[in-house]
Amino acid sequence: MAVSWCDYICWWYSDYFLKRFKLRNNMKKHILGLLFLSVAGTCLTSCGDDFFDTKNYTGVDVDNGLTDASSVRNAVNGEYDWFYHYYFAGDFATMIGDIPTDLSYWNGSSAHMDAIYSYTMTDEESYLLYIWNYGYKVIDNSARAINAGKKLYETSTEEDKKTLDVALAEAYALRAYAKLALVNIYGHQIKVNGQDFSDQPGIVISEEPIKAFEQVSRSTVGETYTSIVADLKDAIEHFGKAGADRGKKVYFTKAAAEGLLARVYLYMENWSDAASYAQQALDDADVSAIATTADEYKAMYSSTGVNTESLFYLSIDDKHNWAANSCGTLWSTYSFSPSPKLQKMYGANDCRTSIFIWDASSTPTKPIFKGGKFPTVTTTNYLINAPEMYLIKAEAKLHGTTAADFDEARNSLLVVAKRNADITSVEQLGTTKDEVLAFLKDERARELFQEGLRLYDLRRWDEKASVYAYGAPEVKFTFNNYKISDFVYPIPVDEIN
């Protein structure tokens, strides 16, 4: 009997985890439908020298030394150190959303993220362990700063309250970002084309710092999203109380928190709030137009901080970068490039292809890219950006019920689609909801490539995906018509009892 790849991988992982957890044979039939075994209420243990470690930042012990507004602010500054590490937002936790999708191509010359790309990873995969560890460093240390800030708040001076408000806002936003990244990677999408998966296993959430060797369990996906929304609303509230943010986009701002909340609501299929917060983010960031020429577009990726469309980016530059572990290296020396499929999706006059530059040694059959949005190892990650807000608003309004919603959807989509100079009117985007939605899905691929969102788009749309491209320059995939909405990465085995 012929066995499909999807059936085989389902069987292999089910059998593997049954042995790993020593489950009874009569339970096997209940988990064959999942790509990876996810156990609701799985017991996990925090390790003393692992992801629940605290950190001394500028000499301040975050367990005992957060005794004033300045120390809380400094502790939050320390959160960005964990957050921007290449183990997390600086590379692995971001790029894992693009590498295993139809947008990426691996030429086979190096062994970086190759198991992720080829779907041969196990629960012992180091990338998955690093993402988990550093995500929880952000979450746990954020909890410490939040708890300390809340205790100090009522007895603080008005000036110190403003300092605490900004610190608390950033801590809540960082924690929300980390939770969303982890639940996207280790949990099911909360909604898949209208179907609710809120009751599926999510991640470990706790409002309190988790002690070393404390036994904890997973919340549901729905509970995880509820906590993410609460954190982001708290962040926005504290930015409002402060009357301002730091005004530097290497720190979370009010606009960035609103933009992230718009993304969360999009995943939840809460169309009204997704559109509302996307527009609020654009308004607060004072963005009303985006680049439409090759020169304008290339300039945004020439150095850190010059991208006027970004709401939040990492403090990666000539002095602070990850060198060989950077995204620039991943998308060049480490063999990854835009897939032949993606390249064919761009029009001849699309300004976004102005950054598609190839190495002198590149050939059609063995492409060697020169970074794209990461042309050097010193180029930063732009994590929350204005074009995504226009696309969120377009998709949300497309699910509206009125002619005005449809018009607003096309107008928002047109802002981004005009990166292709040949597109000048909404009529070119489609005249029916289905046509416009199909265009929007492709536009998200074109616009958000290298921003780490493709995997979650394919899953939430319930696309029959093609993955593991090969045979460049032809459009070929090892696995086709794959129900990727059921794909969930395993929690690292080191974290499971």
List the predicted regions and their residue ranges.
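Bacterial Sec-dependent N-terminal signal peptides
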Residues: 15-31, 37, 41-70, 228, ...
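Hydrophobic-face positions in mid-chain alpha helices that act as interaction patches
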Residues: 74, 104, 251, 269, ...
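Conserved, well-structured interaction surfaces
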Residues: 112-186, 219, 237-240, 244, ...
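Short coil/linker segments at helix-helix boundaries
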Residues: 155, 159-162, 185-226, 230
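Acidic, glycine-rich segments characteristic of secretory precursors and extracytoplasmic regions
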Residues: 47-97, 299, 487-497
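TPR-repeat structural position
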Residues: 225, 271, 403-406
